[in-house]
Amino acid sequence: MSQTALQKVVEHARAGLEVRESFFEQYSQLVVDVSKALAVRLALGSKILFCGNGGSAADCQHLAAELVNRFKLERPPLPGIALTTDSSILTAIGNDYSYEMVFEKQVQALGQPGDVLVGISTSGTSPNVISALKEAKRKGMVTIGMTGISAGEMLPICDHIISVPSKDTAVIQEVHIAVGHLFCHLIDHFLFEAVGELEPYLSGE
């Protein structure tokens, strides 16, 4: 058996575990707060849009599916849309305008004030994600950035930042999907198990 291969497994698992533990030790309350903010917007009839590239695009589709179908709890479908899935829209915008605008124009078309845009970029600098977040901000949407150790250009344009303390793309993505699962889990908790906790946030709307 290859000791080199086994060592790679152990090293990757250890690195991922260390980053995951560090993140949740520091930011568990942030995850709860962002989840509650998402639940409030859904309770008020808004929707959640997601955008990202590559592995982050896959996370967008994964999380939108958990909202529309279900996570663990049996409950009504929730409005989550991944802006990464329609090849005709993506290629039309990319061809006629630029790849930088593939998410921005979808936010222009689909986003409404009070909706949420979750932009996922491990570097924090993906131009099309940044453009979409800026457009969402202009439209009065709630903006959430999920990134790595550097928030990059996301920081001034996001209401909430999930920053994973790592420069390793794979490790960042592993923590992102763990956080995304917790978003889904806690959204269900606040909307269907602990509705009273949202009342103070809904009464002023």
Swiss-Prot record:
Co-factor note (free text): Binds 1 zinc ion per subunit.
Cellular compartments annotated: Cytoplasm
GO cellular component terms attached to this protein's record: cytoplasm
Cofactor(s) demanded: Zn(2+)
Entries under SUPFAM superfamilies matching the protein: SIS domain
Miscellaneous remark of the record: The reaction produces a racemic mixture of D-glycero-alpha-D-manno-heptose 7-phosphate and D-glycero-beta-D-manno-heptose 7-phosphate.
Subunit field text: Homotetramer.
Protein name, as recorded: Phosphoheptose isomerase
Annotated organism of origin: Maridesulfovibrio salexigens (strain ATCC 14822 / DSM 2638 / NCIMB 8403 / VKM B-1763) (Desulfovibrio salexigens)
Encoding gene, per UniProt annotation: gmhA
